[in-house]
């Protein structure tokens, strides 16, 4: 064995690093702006070296031209960004649920900086997204990310044509499922808001002189947050189960 890396080995390492680095750039909890670029770069390098013996056989040979090399690198970066964006987009389910909860508890005006989004959002939405990211690592779901990196080389082989139609269909279905899940997670608050508003309207009709708004506003916040706290365990469990199912789409290629 040669004591130094050959040109083919360097080429394989560059291809692996291109896809894995792009995926890690988008993953929840790892690709955030508050995570140091040095940490992300080091993690991508370590994971690339660890997975090199496993996926080196699925990589194309060294092209004869610089243009060919650049084309392969760009292709792998695009594939990595697509996979990472798909895994990250499912967090919009929690953002949707948080916005609905905030609207139903009259807390939509309470805006805060959301570290997982580029724009500020409601406090409830930021809390749910941070909770979801924490659960991903607390339940070892991030292990499926590593298995998914390996499996992605079987689902989207570097030597096969890049089929964007299938991935676009998967992305559309994922966005639709994320929105539907967000509404489902906020269903207890929607039911509570419907009953509470009907009761408040009935009281206002029965006792016109009673100041319903001044009594209903604090009760809406108190009871709404109580219902939200009681349903929080179910929200976390349902989300992490659905997220693991999404991650297994790629991990399944590696026998995950």
Q: Predicted segment positions?
A:
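Hydrophobic alpha-helical segments and their helix-loop boundaries in membrane
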Residues: 1-256
């Amino acid at each position: 064995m040669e004591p130094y890396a050959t040109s083919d080995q360097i080429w394989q390492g560059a291809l692996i690093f291109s896809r894995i680095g792009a995926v890690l750039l988008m993953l929840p909890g790892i690709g955030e702006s508050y995570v140091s670029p040095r940490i992300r770069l080091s993690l991508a390098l370590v994971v690339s070296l660890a997975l090199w013996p496993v996926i080196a056989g699925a990589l194309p040979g060294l092209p004869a031209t610089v243009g060919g090399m650049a084309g392969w690198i760009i292709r792998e970066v695009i594939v990595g960004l697509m996979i990472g964006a798909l895994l990250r987009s499912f967090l919009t389910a929690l953002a949707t649920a948080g916005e609905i909860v905030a609207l139903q508890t009259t807390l939509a005006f309470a805006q805060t900086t959301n570290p997982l989004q580029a724009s500020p959002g409601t406090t409830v939405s930021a809390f749910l997204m941070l909770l979801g990211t924490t659960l991903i690592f607390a339940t070892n779901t991030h292990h499926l990310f590593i298995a998914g990196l390996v499996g992605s080389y079987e689902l989207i082989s570097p030597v096969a044509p890049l089929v964007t139609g299938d991935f676009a269909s998967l992305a559309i279905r994922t966005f639709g499922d994320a929105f539907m899940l967000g509404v489902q997670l906020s269903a207890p608050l929607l039911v509570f808001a419907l009953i509470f508003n009907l009761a408040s309207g009935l009281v206002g009709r029965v006792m016109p002189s009673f100041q319903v708004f001044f009594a209903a506003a604090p009760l809406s916040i108190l009871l709404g947050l109580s219902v939200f706290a009681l349903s929080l365990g179910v929200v976390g469990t349902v989300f992490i189960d659905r997220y693991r199912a999404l991650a297994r789409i790629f991990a399944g290629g590696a026998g995950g």
